[in-house]
């Protein structure tokens, strides 16, 4: 959701 750790965690 942010762009540093939630790149493939929110999809």
From Swiss-Prot:
One of its GO terms (molecular function) is RNA binding. Residues 1-11 form the RRM domain. Keywords: RNA-binding. The keyword RNA-binding applies. It comes from Populus euphratica (Euphrates poplar). This is Glycine-rich RNA-binding protein 1.
């Amino acid at each position: 959701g942010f762009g540093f750790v939630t790149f493939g965690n929110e999809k």
